[in-house]
Amino acid sequence: MAKKNSQLPSTSEQILERSTTGATFLMMGQLFTKLVTFILNNLLIRFLSPRIFGITAFLEFIQGTVLFFSRDAIRLSTLRISDSGNGIIDDDDEEEYQETHYKSKVLQTAVNFAYIPFWIGFPLSIGLIAWQYRNINAYFITLPFFRWSIFLIWLSIIVELLSEPFFIVNQFMLNYAARSRFESIAVTTGCIVNFIVVYAVQQSRYPMGVVTSDIDKEGIAILAFALGKLAHSITLLACYYWDYLKNFKPKKLFSTRLTKIKTRENNELKKGYPKSTSYFFQNDILQHFKKVYFQLCFKHLLTEGDKLIINSLCTVEEQGIYALLSNYGSLLTRLLFAPIEESLRLFLARLLSSHNPKNLKLSIEVLVNLTRFYIYLSLMIIVFGPANSSFLLQFLIGSKWSTTSVLDTIRVYCFYIPFLSLNGIFEAFFQSVATGDQILKHSYFMMAFSGIFLLNSWLLIEKLKLSIEGLILSNIINMVLRILYCGVFLNKFHRELFTDSSFFFNFKDFKTVIIAGSTICLLDWWFIGYVKNLQQFVVNVLFAMGLLALILVKERQTIQSFINKRAVSNSKDV
């Protein structure tokens, strides 16, 4: 296993195999971590009020914002580092250079770029936290330990950024198993720390001073959240560093320090006295990073803009309700869609570092199959989600939430999930194949979409008083615009590969399934409506199984082809 992890995947078959296997690892990791956080939230939700969930969601938003702006552009850009040559040299013979030293220089290039997130994140975290601290509700500032909680959140950001060089290397080598394992351990540790502190205070067994009032308990609940985040970051760094000491340092594959890289021009490669230069950052990757960073700024404003809006236009209680919706409503998105989206992005970025026709056509084939899967699953969500979601959610939340509108709002949120998911894979494809100029053009459109999103949110929340439902509708409009933009790009890209053939032509055979889904939906609403008891829920499960059976029969050839390919791949491994 260690040997496999130390090899850079080079052929399209190797990259596809690691990516499909990696998607499974990420899904299992997501399933485990979300199961742990799911259990924790269900335990904590009976101790904590919506107000506390609102402020912890706000603190998590600050942490997520700093980490996103610090590292995501680098994570995307380093995937485009070519592993097919590029004139990186050493003084050893050519064979040894190709096998060992070249790989070392490629990984060192990635490590050098991994320093940039820390340089961005350190000042950004201080500035953003200082700015947001002045805007926090005065009630929370007066809570015990609140300033300590803010400091611990900042410290967790810094510690997590220190693990970035190790993450970048494992990402570039498509070592999904290590990453999934380390993140699972870190999340579990953070959740355990969080729960132990809250539970101990509630039981008053290990009080910090004299904990008698609700204010004291709320202050410690926020402190527990911050301690959990810090424990998560420290554990993640420790796991990655242990992996480095075990698998990388003995082989001297790269240095954790910023290191100059020697290169020579390709046209000088065959001469006896090659002209060599040195650099810290590969120029084409650095230029791509700048353009991607600009684009991601607007993408994050749109992706996380709902939190900005809800912090400005909604009460703390409504913020807590929306945080609960995000946790439960998007559970499927984070467990299934997010790992697939990330695996697709990594797969495409590595595959298309060499733009040959075979790789380009393979990328389209993978995207078409994923899109078909997403459309089927989205149909299931739209047909059965609104009717069943509130029935399932009421068993997971405590009495403190029974007087809120969360059971009604979750039904609206179900319509948002398909748009969120489809946009994820479309933008993953766009970011992987687009040139720097195309990404820059996309950034300008994202700027316009940001303005439309803010305007829609203001109209629907502030003027029409739709509260959280208005925010969800604004998000749906936002996703539709982004899907349309990437859809036009995909269609043009498809026509260049397959002359006079539309990308959307691959989805013309959905008529039967859509009619069946619509019929089931109408019957379900006519005879049952919103599910209120177990008997009605069982009927919906039977309806869902019938629709799923129809989908499986319709796609039986594709499924059989995939199984055959996996069997051939496994036989080669043996």
Swiss-Prot record:
Keyword Transmembrane: yes
Stretches assigned to the Lumenal side: 1-24, 70-110, 170-181, 240-319, 394-413, 465-469, 531-532
GO cellular component terms given for this protein: endoplasmic reticulum; endoplasmic reticulum membrane
Compartments in which it is found: Endoplasmic reticulum membrane
Pfam family, one: Rft-1
Keywords: Endoplasmic reticulum, Membrane, Sugar transport, Transmembrane, Transmembrane helix, Transport
GO MF annotations, alphabetized: flippase activity; glycolipid floppase activity
Annotated InterPro entries: RFT1
Principal cellular location given in the protein's record: endoplasmic reticulum
Membrane topology category: Multi-pass membrane protein
Domain of life: Eukaryota
Family: Belongs to the RFT1 family.
Protein name stated in the entry: Man(5)GlcNAc(2)-PP-dolichol translocation protein RFT1
Phylogenetic lineage: Eukaryota, Fungi, Dikarya, Ascomycota, Saccharomycotina
